[in-house]
Amino acid sequence: MSMLAERRRKQKWAVDPRNTAWSNDDSKFGQKMLEKMGWSKGKGLGAQEQGATEHIKVKVKNNHLGLGATNNNEDNWIAHQDDFNQLLAALNTCHGQETADSSDNKEKKSFSLEEKSKISKNRVHYMKFTKGKDLSSRSETDLDCIFGKRRNKKLAQDGCSNSTADEADTSLTTTTTTTSAFTIQEYFAKRMAQLKSKSQAAAPGSDLSETPIEWKKGKKKTKEAAGTDIENSPQHKAKRHKKKKRVEAERGPAAKKRDQVELQPGGPSGDECSDASVEAAEDRVQTPDTQDDVPKPRKRRAKKTLQRPGGVAVDTAPDSAPVKKKKKVSR
């Protein structure tokens, strides 16, 4: 038993593996029909009997040659090259190479990139960039300016003269003049009338124009009514009361004492004190030189003083310390 023995498997052989019984049978229906049409053994099928006369057989390929190649064709590589050259020559004669001497071929075929991008289904360029990328529509001077080629002075002068002449011709041909029967004043008067008619058509009637004034008056009345309501409201009254208390606290106990002295029945009234203070201020202001002239009284705040019967003014400010308020004790 060898080391490389194959695994056992069952294999069935037919009685006629090559099917020779069918091929050797002359009583087949197809063969009879072909014989009626003129075919016989040893002939090929087809109008010219060019078909295969033998059965198809499997051939073993044990070399590196191409399919169908034999040892007889190995030395015929020069003939293959000649056949290839003949094929190229036939193609050149059919399509016809362009000669270099012909003047028509010297002219370059120019095409518009913009038109090509419009015609083509696929987008070649964006529409706003096609004009900039298309150089076929540019002249030689434009291309020279782009690529920086120098030109002779004579050619430049000739080009300038030609361009000026062309510009003059185009300016003469393209000038357009318009004449109107209206003067400037009539034109502007007509325009103003049109604008007024538009504004009148767009603006509402006189009733609508009067409504804003009445609305403003009503708004002012509502504001005044709201102000009076705010003044009479309890919150506003409470705020005023707090403000009054704050002012009295800032004035201090001395001012309160002075008010109490003024309100005593034996003491002078506030009007007399104020009159006396005003007279004293006027005496101070007047000088002996200007007694005849009446000077303008200066506005000054005079301290309130008590005047005794003897004419001596006494300050009502107490020397003692301020009186403290008694706190209420809840029981």
From Swiss-Prot:
GO BP terms, alphabetized: mitotic metaphase chromosome alignment; negative regulation of G2/M transition of mitotic cell cycle; negative regulation of protein ubiquitination; negative regulation of telomere maintenance via telomerase; positive regulation of protein localization to nucleolus; protein localization to chromosome, telomeric region; protein localization to nucleolus; regulation of protein stability
Single GO term (MF): telomerase RNA binding
UniProt feature, compositional bias: Basic and acidic residues: 247-261
Entry superkingdom: Eukaryota
Chain positions with Phosphoserine modification: 233, 269, 274, 277
Cellular component GO terms held in the UniProt record: chromosome, telomeric region; kinetochore; nuclear chromosome; nucleolus; spindle
Residue intervals of the G-patch domain: 26-72
Span of the annotated motif TBM: 291-301
Intracellular or extracellular location(s): Nucleus; Nucleus, Nucleolus; Chromosome, Telomere; Chromosome, Centromere, Kinetochore
Pfam families attached to this UniProt entry: G-patch
Residue span of region Telomerase inhibitory domain (TID): 254-328
Keywords, in A-Z order: Centromere, Chromosome, Kinetochore, Nucleus, Phosphoprotein, Telomere, Tumor suppressor
Residue stretches of biased makeup (Basic residues): 236-246, 297-306
Residue numbers spanned by region Disordered: 1-28, 156-175, 197-331
Family matches, as InterPro entries: G_patch_dom, PINX1
Function, in words: Microtubule-binding protein essential for faithful chromosome segregation. Mediates TRF1 and TERT accumulation in nucleolus and enhances TRF1 binding to telomeres. Inhibits telomerase activity. May inhibit cell proliferation and act as tumor suppressor.
Homology family: Belongs to the PINX1 family.
Written domain comment of the UniProt record: The TID (telomerase inhibiting domain) domain is sufficient to bind TERT and inhibits its activity.
Quaternary context: Interacts with MCRS1, TERT, TERF1, NCL/nucleolin, and the telomerase RNA.
Name of the protein: PIN2/TERF1-interacting telomerase inhibitor 1
Source organism of this protein record: Rattus norvegicus
Gene assigned in the entry: Pinx1
